[in-house]
Amino acid sequence: MVRLCTTNFLAYRATGSPLLLLYFYLCSLSSVKSSAAASYTNASDYVLRNVFEHSDQCYKDSFVYVRADDKKSDPFITYSTTKECSERLKKNDLPEKLPTCPPGLIDLELKPVYVPKSQISYPYANLNISVTAHSSVDTIAFRLECLSASDGSDVYCSNSKAMYINGVKEWPCRGIHLSSRVQYPTRFSYSCFRLTSFSVYAINATILPQKCRVSTIMTAPYFDDMFPEILVDPTTNQSIITKTDPFWAPMLSADFSDKNAIWVRLGKAERAECETMVVNVYKEHDDDSQKVTFLEILTVKCPETAVKWENQKAGRYLLTAYVPIRGCKFYCEKKERGCRQCLRTHLNLVIYKNRASLSWLALQKFKDYGFEIFIAVVVLLILIIVLAVTGFGYVLWRDKVRSREVRNIALTEFVKVMIVYADDNDLHTDCVKKLVENLRNCASCDPVFDLEKLITAEQIVPSRWLVDQISSLKKFIIVVSDCAEKILDTEASETHQLVQARPFADLFGPAMEMIIRDATHNFPEARKKYAVVRFNYSPHVPPNLAILNLPTFILPEQFAQLTAFLHNVEHTERANVTQNISEAQIHEWNLCASRMMSFFVRNPNWLETRWKPKDELAALHLKRQSPVIVPIQTEEDRIAASIKYNLVPPQALVDSDDEDDVDLQPHASHQNQPLILLPPEQCGPDSDSDSESDSSSESESESDNEGEDPKTIVVKKS
């Protein structure tokens, strides 16, 4: 039937008229009825028509579509005999084994067909073979090959003369040749191959010009089991079939179109009903015994007819299919009463190569050769352990040999290193001086020591000097002591501070702030730049300094290791590093440390005199005293008073030889004026800012300030 509606009628009808709507309805209805399967109609911009016609009703399920306006004839050629089909295939010189067709190219479908009783035969079953092509192909051909038969009733398994062509046995074959004008999908179907119960067939569909093949192995149960009378009787109502629910067995086939799995397909009578169909899988033993091993159960939910059987190894298998109807069981014990055994279909299957994923194959290999793999793993582990022990022993032996080697390293460069320490007391400073002395004399170092740089040079500003040294030097030695531990304690430093005992403030705190800030920015470089040293009497490294994990040395025992660090000499911790430092120098250094330890014993509370609260160290307020009236009558009296009270001498005394007349005049006017002398201000952290404001406090006796060294004298008029 042609699915084409002409437009001549539309030219005379207005849009939306009832006749126009009726016309489109009739066209669409005829289009649906024109195809055996509407789902295969090509939804394109033009109308197609099925041009497949054959006098043999065995091809009735086939269809070939071309465009409706295609007037050319012969869009296809059928090969209706085995001879024609075989000759077409032989022209392409095909090998015995062809590759499997790619997915999506064709579909191979099998189903049983019931043929009712006639005047010349009893009821029997045919096999319907359908190949649907979804892409452009040239030729579709399929053969039916009998693999085995239960008896001689199967005509295809016999050696009758009808099976031979020119003396060569040819299996039944049917095919079709398609022109380039054919539209897809296209189906070629043949339903007249006789199906014999319990026979096993192989159906091979060959596609040209792709030269590929799809193979299926199938079998059928007993005829009456597959087609119960109630299912094939046309007079029986479907409701009666549903109510009766007769027992039946399915047709069973194995599709090899998937390279990594097998599709198990089940066929049934057209009106047979079910909920599920079950396939039991058994593995046959390789020793040709009758024993089988149960593997798994495959379940197909109706109306589906296929299930994917994945991960199989090469070997022989037995597939048993049945339909659990009305509580029937696959197997009934002999003593079990009221048990009904389901009707079953058996298929012996041979898989010549593995059809499974790589992961599953690897797991199966492990299971099959588990003991051998275990032995191999144990041997490998033993070998690794032996190699590890051998390597470890070699490393120990090498280190032992190297430890016996003596490396003489000449310290040719002078390293400039800064000593960062806290001013605990004079005895501690003596130990630091010994460190400086030994660094200079025995370690080829140029120590930067504040007592040498700041006290001898009055023009240097301590804070600026500290910043210059930290920004320019590459090596620093941090000396840990009791006062240093207090200064590094953040909470203690908020309320207490170190009593100043030198002309300049203690620089340990500011120096450590800059060092810690620099070290936290780059830990690897800090470990090469900063070193922490402790004397025998020193406390442990404070936690906030120990967290930096800087190299730490105990002096004088590890003075050689400290020297190696300062000169960047690489060595292991177990290396024995020695240095040309005399025993006498070590002895003197130990004596300094011993004096410090003895001082701790004699003065257990010495730290309280050096570490005091900040409010006690505030600037001492100067209190006004009774003025001391010094009568000055002459210039000589003024000079004498200046010398006695550390005043700057009068200008007349300095320049008396050159400027007597000029300088004596301003002083002459004050000869008879008395002067008031105030005691000097005491040094304190806030003395500069508070001295003048606090000078008005109430007076105290002169005895309060006896013994103090006057540093500043303020001269005021009375």
Curated annotation (Swiss-Prot):
Q: Which organism is it from?
A: Caenorhabditis elegans
Q: Where are the transmembrane segments?
A: 373-393
GO biological processes:
interleukin-17-mediated signaling pathway; positive regulation of locomotion; sensory processing
Primary subcellular site in the record, as a coarse category? membrane
Gene that encodes the chain: ilcr-2
What membrane topology is annotated for this entry?
Answer: Single-pass type I membrane protein
Query: What's a Gene Ontology MF term here?
Result: interleukin-17 receptor activity
Q: How does it assemble?
A: Component of a heterodimeric receptor complex composed of ilcr-1 and ilcr-2. The receptor complex interacts with actl-1 and ilc-17.1 with the interaction being mediated by ilcr-2.
Q: Where are the compositionally biased (Acidic residues) regions?
A: 687-707
Tissues of expression: Expressed in most neurons, and in pharyngeal muscle.
Q: Which residues form the SEFIR domain?
A: 414-564
Secretion signal: which residues?
A: 1-30
Specify the protein name.
Interleukin cytokine receptor-related protein 2
Top-level division of the source organism's lineage: Eukaryota
Sorted UniProt keywords: Cell membrane, Glycoprotein, Membrane, Receptor, Signal, Transmembrane, Transmembrane helix
Query: So which residues have sugars stuck on them?
Result: 42, 128, 204, 237
